[in-house]
Amino acid sequence: MTMGALGVVYGDIGTSPLYALKEAAKAAAHGATVTPDAVLGVASLILWALLLIISLKYALLILRADNRGEGGIVALLALLHARNAQPGTWRSHLLVVGLVGAALLYGDGAITPAISVLSAIEGLKVDAPSLAPAVVPVTVVILVGLFMMQKQGTGFIGRIFGPVMLAWFAVLAALGIHGIVKAPAVLAALSPLYAVEFLIHQDFHVSFAILGAAFLAVTGGEAMYADMGHFGRLPIRLAWFAICLPALVLNYFGQAALLITDPAMIENPFFQLCPDALHYPLVAFSAVATVIASQAIISGVFSLTQQSIQLGFLPRMQIRHTTSDAIGQIYVPLVNWLLAAATLGAVLSFGSSDALAGAYGIAVSLLMAITTLLAALVAIQWGYSPWLVVAVNGAFFVIDVIFFSANSIKLFEGGWFPLLLAALVAFMMLTWRSGVKLVEAARAKLRQPEEDLIETAVNKCSARLPGTAVFLASAPRGVPLALTQFVKHNRVLHERVLLVTVLIEESPHIPDEERAEVIEIIPGITRVILHYGFMQNPTIFDGLTLTCRQGKLPGIDLSDITYYVGRETIIPREDVPGMWVWREGLFAFLQRNAERSAAFFGVPTKQVVEFGTELEI
């Protein structure tokens, strides 16, 4: 598991040495020749950012806030029960903050592959400046190949991610030692005083520019928490403290040592650390490492999308499982191509890692601040002393805010790009969430109580059709609109009627023994509630198969079932209380293009009948 964590969790932060110290040193030089004191200050700042933010905050503190083993901002929202918060309550405001945090990951997901692969391919320019025009085209080719590969799954090549990244961290350490040996005075930067004194003696704007650039060294730290469910807390901590942290510190200090001895190397100190004979192999290896880092963030976005759909934060989309023997190997076509468009747009628009550095960091720093806040609320909910939580999380929150403020000065240098992407995603999430509530309220007005169904079954539908009918119900109460429509048009019921509702719980996984809740309304009419976790695939056919196997639905032949599914057409109306009509129009568009319920819940296509209903919101 530790090896797996190396390949998935630490790909992003592991490739930060390609650009982080370079950008921080350039900010410290602010157009002049970088001085040894500036280099020591930058190296010290990066070291203590890694220790405070990654080692202390994430590895030791945030990883404790798990939702039955799962991490990430969506898991935090589930722990805080924000999904069903009433409008106007503090939890409803918390939901908005949390969804903004989730949306920021999409902005990060577009920037990370762009800056990572660009920074690796830019190594070609070190020995051959004439190759500079090829950097962007080569980057585009690599990224197009990466996104095209997603539909095939990464099961096979994913197995080599860990060993490849282990070799990468070994190379980072070796390069760093090679540089430190030439200028051991760089080890003085181990003292935090160098970072503090250096920042104090700088102009305010320069200090913020340096902080914003140094923050690039810790981007990717959020993956430690987001991927906790895949690898576990202990392997993630072990990989960080035993392998990643030492290798990163050695490499950053090696680059700093190189700049102390030769400030002219500031354009690309990472590749200048390497002996000339190994330069091009290092460029190739860097490209492989950045592809692995990009794959990790793409897979993370797919996983976040799945969780958000399950919890009702995003419209249903087609989700393909790329392998049957590995949990979590999924492919979301729509998200893949939207992310590809955003990433390629970033590469073509900004054109270099230096330019993209301005766009990178602001979304991640805001996300880290939101994570710290939500984790503090979870700790208080779990019974920790509020004073202790405020003291500990408050200190980290101040650090997060400082870094976010420092990154905010890059807003017009490219920081707007990930924030714009995040704003669009957050707006869509909030619109979808509000629209779903309006639709459910409209359904509730039309939904008949169970008593009416009983009366209909006993007095008006004495004749029964052979076989079993399954009616999908959005709520575990009342009569589904599809059943009401069926009785209205046919004036008959089947011998067995199952009202099936899928409920997504705020836990990542629900065990099989707790999957089905079976309630007999009257003989022949049964309500079945299938419970799934937000990390599970909610398949109705599999759920009913399990329920029958458990003996809760005797006499049901699953091959002789007809599934009746309602499909609503949303009609925005200005005279009906709700959202602004243009937002209702957006919701109607999203709902119209969402994955159909039957397909999303894995209902056998040859056994489905759909009933249409118009709903005004």
UniProtKB/Swiss-Prot annotation:
Keywords: Cell inner membrane, Cell membrane, Ion transport, Membrane, Potassium, Potassium transport, Symport, Transmembrane, Transmembrane helix, Transport. Pfam families: K_trans, K_trans_C. The keyword Membrane applies. Its main location: membrane. One of its GO terms (molecular function) is potassium ion transmembrane transporter activity. It is found in: Cell inner membrane. One of its GO terms (cellular component) is plasma membrane. It is a multi-pass membrane protein. Disulfide bonds: none annotated. It catalyses: K(+)(in) + H(+)(in) = K(+)(out) + H(+)(out). One of its GO terms (biological process) is potassium ion transport. The chain crosses the membrane at residues 42-62, 95-115, 129-149, 160-180, 206-226, 240-260, 282-302, 330-350, 360-380, 386-406, 411-431. The keyword 4Fe-4S does not apply. Belongs to the HAK/KUP transporter (TC 2.A.72) family. Transport of potassium into the cell. Likely operates as a K(+):H(+) symporter. This is Probable potassium transport system protein Kup 3. It comes from Bradyrhizobium diazoefficiens (strain JCM 10833 / BCRC 13528 / IAM 13628 / NBRC 14792 / USDA 110).
